[in-house]
């Protein structure tokens, strides 16, 4: 069984809500999933997973949240060798750099050698509408299809 990690930073609970919608969707495909807050995550464990999804909110004018800074710096030091990854997060359009921390993680993962799903998921505040929830679910399914999981395991994503 393929192993996936979803790790996230969430101050208001919005990014955590997104993480759990993604987790619930991925569980439909019988993945072994760990869902862990980012400040409880040891970056050296990333390479023990087949898939890693990182979620974050953006602090202030485009900064990483405090609780994600150490993890971010630790991951930069690891060679990820094609590890399949994706980034998601929540933000507020009233700030000039909407969900910029998601972009920062996306670029850093590429620089660390990960294979990065280029379709990031960015939700305004909380995933409260049916459309937001479906966007989260579609992101999870799209990531799996991109990662070629379906072909390996003969599972059809619907």
From Swiss-Prot:
Domain Flavodoxin-like, chain residue ranges per copy: 4-144
Pfam families: Flavodoxin_1
InterPro entries, per database record: Flav_short, Flavdoxin-like, Flavodoxin, Flavodoxin/NO_synth, Flavoprotein-like_sf
Signal peptide: none
GO MF term set: FMN binding; oxidoreductase activity, acting on NAD(P)H
Cofactor(s) of this protein: FMN
Keyword entries, A-Z: Electron transport, Flavoprotein, FMN, Transport
Family statement: Belongs to the flavodoxin family.
Function noted in UniProt: Low-potential electron donor to a number of redox enzymes.
Protein name listed in UniProt: Probable flavodoxin 1
Organism of this sequence: Bacillus subtilis (strain 168)
């Amino acid at each position: 069984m393929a192993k996936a990690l979803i790790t996230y930073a969430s101050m208001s609970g919005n990014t955590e809500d997104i993480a759990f919608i993604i987790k619930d969707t991925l569980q439909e495909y019988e993945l072994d999933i760990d869902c862990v807050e980012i400040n409880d995550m040891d970056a050296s464990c990333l390479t023990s997973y087949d898939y890693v999804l990182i979620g974050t909110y953006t602090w202030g004018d485009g900064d990483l949240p405090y609780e994600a800074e150490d993890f971010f710096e630790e991951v930069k030091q690891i060679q990820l060798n094609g590890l399949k990854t994706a980034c998601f997060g929540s933000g507020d359009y009233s700030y000039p750099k909407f969900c910029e921390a998601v972009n920062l993680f996306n670029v850093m993962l590429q620089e660390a050698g990960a294979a990065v799903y280029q379709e990031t998921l960015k939700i305004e505040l909380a995933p409260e509408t049916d459309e937001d929830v479906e966007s989260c679910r579609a992101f999870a399914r799209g990531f799996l299809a991109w990662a070629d999981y379906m072909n390996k395991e003969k599972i059809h994503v619907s």
